[in-house]
Design a protein with these regions (language model features):
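Hydrophobic positions on the alpha1 helix immediately C-terminal to the Walker A/P-loop
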Residues: 38, 42
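Post-Walker A helix-loop "phosphate-sensing" segment adjacent to the P-loop in P-loop NTPases
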Residues: 43-57
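Short, conserved, surface-exposed binding loops centered on an aromatic residue
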Residues: 17, 45-48, 78-82
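Hydrophobic anchor at the beta1->P-loop junction of P-loop NTPases
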Residues: 27-29
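Phosphate-binding P-loop
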Residues: 14-22
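N-terminal pre-Walker A segment at the start of P-loop NTPase domains
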Residues: 1-14
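Conserved glycine(s) of the Walker
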Residues: 34-35
Length: 172
């Protein structure tokens, strides 16, 4: 089951107005809590109900694409390609422990979308642990500041969905 706040907020999220306002949707919680599923389902509804252009991408894949573009001196061009999407879902931002170059392109991407286009992000790390992502305290604070400025923040503090399913399977 979804945490109470996530259930309560769902109707207002599904109306899509947060995308019109270039707001972000940030989900936090331990692995297996349903964050990715929640964001993917919202993204699917944004496509079906509102005809928004939505991209779902893992943090690792996003960073790799940005790095390749930077090395080819085409980072600006790659960032403009992402502008075609009304909202981009970035999955598992905390899993990738970034090098300085990776951190820089990820920060550039986040800063580029700030107040212009929406992001939906899942993370296993709370903000106090984001120094593991960005390494530099100032960059960490700047990234968090931009993301939370216009955001809906949801904590998935429920039991593990995978654990619940495993327990049900054992009982059969």
């Amino acid at each position: 089951l979804l945490p109470e706040k996530c259930r309560r907020m769902l109707p207002s999220i599904l109306d899509g107005s947060f995308i019109e306002r270039a707001e972000n949707l940030l989900t936090f919680g331990l692995p297996g809590r349903g964050k990715t599923h929640y964001l993917a389902a919202i993204g699917y509804e944004m496509i079906l109900q509102h005809k928004y252009n939505v991209l779902f991408i893992s943090t690792f894949k996003l960073v790799q694409k940005l790095l390749i573009a930077k090395q080819a001196l085409e980072l600006e061009k790659q960032l403009k390609k992402y502008d075609q999407f009304d909202v981009i879902i970035i999955d598992d931002i905390g899993y990738v422990q970034h090098s300085r170059e990776e951190m820089e392109v990820l920060f550039t991407f986040l800063a580029e979308r700030y107040e212009r286009k929406s992001l939906m992000i899942s993370s296993n790390l709370v903000f106090s642990e984001w120094d593991k992502i960005f390494k530099n305290p100032m960059t960490t604070m700047a990234a968090i500041d931009r993301l939370v400025h216009h955001s809906i923040i949801l904590e998935f503090n429920n039991d593990s969905v995978r654990e619940q399913e495993a327990m049900k399977a054992l009982k059969k």
